[in-house]
Swiss-Prot record:
Family: Belongs to the universal ribosomal protein uS4 family.
Main function: One of the primary rRNA binding proteins, it binds directly to 16S rRNA where it nucleates assembly of the body of the 30S subunit. With S5 and S12 plays an important role in translational accuracy.
A molecular function GO annotation: rRNA binding
Protein name per Swiss-Prot or TrEMBL: Small ribosomal subunit protein uS4B
Family matches, as NCBIfam families: PRK05327.1 (NF003717), rpsD_bact (TIGR01017)
Keywords, ordered alphabetically: Ribonucleoprotein, Ribosomal protein, RNA-binding, rRNA-binding
All copies of domain S4 RNA-binding, residue ranges: 88-150
GO cellular component, one term: small ribosomal subunit
Organism: Clostridium perfringens (strain SM101 / Type A)
GO biological process: ribosomal small subunit biogenesis; translation
SMART domains (alphabetical): Ribosomal_S4, S4
Length: 197
């Protein structure tokens, strides 16, 4: 399986966006260290925004391009459709539900088979959830203190399109998110323009 490699904090500073979720990722960022601080052409600005979004969700270029194609073929605005596709990935939902402290950690947990989706084991991070799907931490995985603490510590801080059942270690993709509810600072229209050329 292909992975995004390289120093993660350095990548955050270069992109001018905390794409790993770690509170110290941007700590050493000085003005002038990110591409966002440099004068860029319109193309450069669009490319940077695309790289930011791809890095945030940890998606490889080929897969990201497929998502873009799907977004352009949908009936919704391409930018918002792209965000919805990325947001509904299982690894991201595991993160949003509070089982993991980062999307990267969530991806590892999914790969290792720690979750059931609607009662069935799913170990594919890119698996797309539908509205109403339930994600449950497996019984044997509840013996891992870190997983349990992550979930319980996140109670009350989840995004509004997710509901949780603390006693059952369950998260539910309750409804389609509104754009303003997705907690990522990105200008998706720039990405649409990048792929419209």
């Amino acid at each position: 399986m292909a992975k995004m490699m390289g120093p993660r904090f350095k990548m955050c500073r270069r992109l001018g966006l905390n794409v790993v979720g770690h509170p110290k990722a941007m700590k050493r960022a000085d003005r002038g260290t990110s591409r966002a601080d440099k004068k860029l052409s319109d193309y450069g600005i669009q490319l940077l925004e695309k790289q930011r979004l791809r890095a945030y969700y940890g998606v490889m270029e080929r897969q990201f391009t497929r998502y873009v194609d799907q977004a352009f073929n949908s009936k919704e605005q391409p930018g918002e459709a792209l965000l919805m596709i990325l947001e509904s990935r299982l690894d991201n939902m595991v993160y949003r539900m509070g089982f993991a402290s980062s999307i990267r950690q969530a991806r590892q947990m999914v790969n290792h088979g720690h979750f059931l989706v609607n009662g069935k084991k799913v170990n594919i991070p890119s698996f797309r959830l539908n509205i109403g799907d339930e994600v449950v931490l497996r019984e044997k995985s509840r013996k891992t203190e870190m997983f349990v603490n992550n979930f319980k510590d996140s109670i009350g801080s989840e995004v509004p399109y997710i509901s949780k059942e603390e006693d059952n270690f369950k998260g539910i993709f309750a409804r389609k998110p509104k754009r303003e509810e997705i907690p990522i600072t990105i200008q998706e229209q720039l990405i649409v323009e990048f792929y419209s050329k």
